[in-house]
């Protein structure tokens, strides 16, 4: 081999460790692995319930029930630990007008809040709803978005929720005479009268729900909780 054909020292050093095998092509369209994909997020702390009076005898909400509901709310709402009691039938009186008044957010902004309605009937059945807006008279319009859902406690260890189906937009409708959630074929998913004494619950297209309790019932307790700032 002629000396002129030999690689120079600089070339030999620059080729140190190389092989004749071409490296595998890199797929530039494939995203890099996200190390957080395999990370288990820490559990959320238990919900802190604020607003019950020491003398209140009938309390619907528990930390266990609140945790079940929190599992289904939007992520931004899920992060709030404190739930504030806005209205209690026992503490504030049996009036739908009072319920509406006490639900007005302190800063007028509901974008950072969620609202949980809880009802207990005379047979001890517990059920309710989660909504993205506070309960208020909305004229002749329905309101609420796809984050809303109905829920029920079937027994001490069984919670069931009914999410928005998209079949119609009859999510929440309130007027001075009644409060309602869900609808279709002339039936409400949940309906309460203006005195908060009686109510009805039927299957409805909005949430694809079964009756949340007895279809016609007498009210024992009603609560509304604000989740957020």
UniProtKB/Swiss-Prot annotation:
Role, per record: May be involved in protection from oxidative damage.
Encoding gene per record: OXR1
Subcellular location, principal: mitochondrion
Signal peptide (UniProt feature, chain positions): none
Gene Ontology terms describing biological process: protein retention in Golgi apparatus; protein-containing complex disassembly; response to oxidative stress
Family, similarity comment: Belongs to the OXR1 family.
PROSITE patterns: TLDC
Pfam families attached to this UniProt entry: TLD
Keyword match Transferase: no
Full protein name: Oxidation resistance protein 1
Organism: Yarrowia lipolytica (strain CLIB 122 / E 150)
Region (Disordered): 1-44
Domain TLDc: 59-228
Keywords tagged on the record: Mitochondrion
